């Protein structure tokens, strides 16, 4: 699982929601996953998705590509504001039969 920030990783901060939840903290909220599969977390970015740019997309693509060498699939957590743009970029750049969600 590759985390990039967004609302899913946000907690209350001084100026509203701030992405600061780690991947392991997210997994700890879903104890039912333990024993079903092995999940490794990579806390790659910690951004509000409105701040995602092509540079971050390239970093995500590289991390996903590296992760696929040792895993059966990749889950990327991401905010909703630019999710469609990131997904489109990853669709064009990751040529893999493995699932990237």
Report each predicted region and the residues it spans.
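N-terminal glycine-rich anion-binding loop in soluble enzyme alpha/beta folds
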Residues: 1-68
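Short beta-strand segments at enzyme active-site cores
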Residues: 42, 74-77
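Short acidic/histidine-rich motifs immediately flanking catalytic phosphotransfer sites
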Residues: 69-73
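Short Gly/Thr/Asp-enriched flexible loops that form oxyanion-binding sites at enzyme active sites
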Residues: 76-98
């Amino acid at each position: 699982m590759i985390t990039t920030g967004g609302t899913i990783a946000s907690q209350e901060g001084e100026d509203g929601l701030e992405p600061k939840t780690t991947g392991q903290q997210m997994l700890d909220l879903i104890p039912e996953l333990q024993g079903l599969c092995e999940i490794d977390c990579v806390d790659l970015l910690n951004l509000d998705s409105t701040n995602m740019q092509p540079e971050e997309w390239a970093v995500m693509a590289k991390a996903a590509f590296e992760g696929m060498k040792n895993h059966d699939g990749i889950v990327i957590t991401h905010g909703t504001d630019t999710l469609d743009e990131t997904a489109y970029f990853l669709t064009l750049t990751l040529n893999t039969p493995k699932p990237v969600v």
